[in-house]
Amino acid sequence: MENNDDLMPREKLLASGAKALSDYELLAIFLRTGIKGCPVISLSKNVLTHFGSLHALLSSDKKAFCSVKGLGITQFIQLQAITEMTKRYLKQEMLSTPIINDPETVKLFLLTELQHEEREVFMVLFLDNQHRLIKKERLFLGTINVSAVYPREIIKEALYCNAAALILAHNHPSGVTEPSYSDQLITKKIQDAAELMEICVLDHLIVGKSDCYSFAENCLL
């Protein structure tokens, strides 16, 4: 039977909202119950200690996840479903709301898309003239540098879907979001090519493990 301490995260969420909870408290709500000799709060802390972070837990594969005492295939399936629902929610939010009005949603969307990638992925969000999402495309994979990213391919795709604006994004698997000189050079080349076709590059976001670096917010566009 769960003790009062085990119920605290649920009560805290109802009183203060989910943002007020720590990682282990959120995980405890997801797990719901502990195992023999280990109440859910303790289990949650043990799981996070084992993986090292919430990020590592969420990006673990089935074998690694289910190898931890107290976790199993049911929780793995539920977690995968929750992650996918989050991605779809954010995408639907972006389809219905002008992106420029909600930059935090864009960051969250890109984090869910790219933060777990082990290789660099270059993604482009194609937007209409009201800055609503038309579609997203992963255009380039592998080491992202000037020779690997082709502005003409991006502009060709933008013209095909009648995009009026673009948001560029790529991840740094290292987790370090500071842009390199190559990142800045790529951005400038794409921006110059887009301007020739009267297409606006709104931002270039570098995605790390838990946050994003915005070129626009740092006056690099």
From Swiss-Prot:
This protein's name: UPF0758 protein CGSHiEE_07200
Keywords noted in UniProt: Hydrolase, Metal-binding, Metalloprotease, Protease, Zinc
Pfam (any one): RadC
Coiled coil: none
CDD domains: MPN_DUF2466
NCBIfam families named among the record's database cross-references: PRK00024.1 (NF000642), radc (TIGR00608)
Top-level taxon of origin: Bacteria
Single GO MF descriptor: metallopeptidase activity
